[in-house]
Amino acid sequence: MAMKKLLIASLLFSSATVYGAEGFVVKDIHFEGLQRVAVGAALLSMPVRTGDTVNDEDISNTIRALFATGNFEDVRVLRDGDTLLVQVKERPTIASITFSGNKSVKDDMLKQNLEASGVRVGESLDRTTIADIEKGLEDFYYSVGKYSASVKAVVTPLPRNRVDLKLVFQEGVSATIQQINIVGNHAFTTNELISHFQLRDEVPWWNVVGDRKYQKQKLAGDLETLRSYYLDRGYARFNIDSTQVSLTPDKKGIYITVNITEGDQYKLSGVQVTGNLAGHSAEIEELTKIEPGELYNGTKVTKMEDDIKKLLGRYGYAYPRVQSMPEINDADKTVKLRVNVDAGNRFYVRKIRFEGNDTSKDSVLRREMRQMEGAWLGSDLVDQGKERLNRLGYFETVDTDTQRVPGSPDQVDVVYKVKERNTGSFNFGIGYGTESGVSFQIGVQQDNWLGTGYAVGINGTKNDYQTYSELSVTNPYFTVDGVSLGGRIFYNDFQADDADLSDYTNKSYGTDVTLGFPINEYNSLRAGLGYVHNKLSNMQPQVAMDRYLESMGEYGKDSFAADDFTFNYGWTYNKLDRGYFPTDGSRVNLTGKVTIPGSDNEYYKLSLDTATYVPIDDDHKWVVLGRTRWGYGDGIGGKEMPFYENFYAGGSSTVRGFQSNTIGPKAVYKKGAHSSNDEYDDYEECTESNGCQSDDAVGGNAMAVASFELITPTPFISEKYANSVRTSLFWDMGTVWDTNWQASRYPDYPDYSDPGNIRMSAGIALQWMSPLGPLVFSYAQPFKKYDGDKAEQFQFNIGKTW
């Protein structure tokens, strides 16, 4: 064997040593140790070619180049006569990646981070990268207070230079905060300051936000909260001098000490605005007014800056710069605020684009826009477009993005990015509701028919007390000005006694047509005409029913038919932030109808529904909801409102915890009537001369219902499904009464004209917008009820109801 000369040291990992510095001409290049890497690929990565004259520097560059490919753990370059011998040791290939012991970090997240670092199945194993990942993961655990955590990479060799990579986690437990000390505070007590922190050394049972488990990120947020607390109260010189986080020897306890300098309180002496105000100095001056002697307030200063930006944004200045510089006068303890404004260029909208609307037509979204193409960019108009899209109810999320046009100094494109939700379904199936029993459903319900914005429904249902079918169509943009046109035809066979109501059967059919007129962004009016035919039978005489029949001149009959024509009207105020599962805003809906000439009945009826959502955190995860429902109706010209038009309460949509429609006046059957009351055998004849009290609800011509709910984050639900599931704690109350009840005539029975007989319940509810339709579950406990009321703690409904 020929004498081999060792040429140069292998960089970083291992090498040979240079024995000669003279150059030589390479006649051939030979590799040893290649397995997975092709010879051609290795040659391409080298700066040396056959025929080149090489020296020590060339050899060093060759080694560097081979290491730079990431394919080799070791590289040696040797000379064998005129042949360059390259000895390599390839890095092993990763055959599999597994995890063990990780609970805080999910497998999918770990895989994403590993892939971002180039660690994936089929790639070479870089031990340096693995070591960095180990340290990075341990640092993450330390940042969330798990100081005893460890992460170890276990590499198991396999045949053909392959390895299995396994990351073994020992997460340990989170260190608990033992004590938080604030040093240097004189104006406020430590307890008062800590009460605004997320991290706490003591957490009362009612505090759902506080946390004793240490997290570095939360501490940073709490320190910023502390800074803002002082700056908002005039302490312009406030400073956090240092923060010490001490760990107990067993790594299970944390002591936090925050050293601060409060300084003195300062008052604002004035605000001076300078710069390019784009001709809006008067409006900006209004935004910067201060009260004499007002304390310096950091939050108000930030809000003032934001208000100036919003003002300029409404006039097309999309990227204004607003900078406040406080000039502190320590002598008289005042601050003069200098505000420099640079409005920048005025921008115009070149195009408005929509992304993600795979079903909805562009025209359906575009007609909701208030920002026009070719006009200057108005941030308020862009936001209005987002609000209107959200209120349609077609989308899970709506986001906006303003993109500058390349090469143009004053043009932007406005992009609305939507995520569509299922706005309808074709269904044929069986459902069950505690109010309706077994239900058979068939139909098509689509709120965004073929992406046109039309609401179309062909629906039918059959349950224990009702057979119902309906065809409905609504065009929300019957005219380009937003006038809507809707209509429906329906048929209903209603067995009242099976719905916990007084005994009668009503077969009805009808139609109605309604026009809607937008007044402004949030208000609209409705007007329309309707026709309904009611055919009643099997009427068992009871006081409220007889009173109506007597007013119609039909006293004593057990069957009756009426044809009514109605003028229908309504008003809606809607400022909710989205069409389903709102978290902010209010909605008011007033509906009414009155019979018109040609009708057998003469009456009017009004209903008012309100809902107000108030978020109590920035993320809108915690929301307070208040709802009310009011109803009143009465006869006209000596006639009574039909008893089958009465208001009812009880059930999942009014007062939960009570059976559907059971709250309020009960039937007092006349002598000779047959009652389905539980106190009697079915259809036993009433023999009392003054009538027989029953538990059958008859409703009333007046109703009041209120509900207060605390909407909470749904536990055990991932963020992916957060927009389709909602949980809440609620308190319901309601009453139904009959203003025409003659208490003096029936002294032996409850006074059903008294509106003070309020029922109350409290409980928990879960709503899920499932692929089958809305699922609503509730559990409520009535805590104020009256004789004859029927409790039903657990209630649920599956599928769409009509």
Swiss-Prot record:
GO terms for biological process: Gram-negative-bacterium-type cell outer membrane assembly; protein insertion into membrane. One of its GO terms (cellular component) is Bam protein complex. It is found in: Cell outer membrane. The keyword Transmembrane applies. The keyword Repeat applies. Its main location: membrane. It holds the Pfam family Omp85. Residues 1-20 form the signal peptide. It comes from the Bacteria. PROSITE patterns: POTRA (PS51779). Residues 24-91, 92-172, 175-263, 266-344, 347-421 form the POTRA domain. Belongs to the BamA family. PANTHER family: OUTER MEMBRANE PROTEIN ASSEMBLY FACTOR BAMA, SORTING AND ASSEMBLY MACHINERY SAMM50 PROTEIN FAMILY MEMBER. Part of the outer membrane protein assembly complex, which is involved in assembly and insertion of beta-barrel proteins into the outer membrane. Constitutes, with BamD, the core component of the assembly machinery. Part of the Bam complex, which is composed of the outer membrane protein BamA, and four lipoproteins BamB, BamC, BamD and BamE. HAMAP family: OM_assembly_BamA (MF_01430). This is Outer membrane protein assembly factor BamA. It comes from Escherichia fergusonii (strain ATCC 35469 / DSM 13698 / CCUG 18766 / IAM 14443 / JCM 21226 / LMG 7866 / NBRC 102419 / NCTC 12128 / CDC 0568-73). The lineage of its organism: Bacteria, Pseudomonadati, Pseudomonadota, Gammaproteobacteria, Enterobacterales.
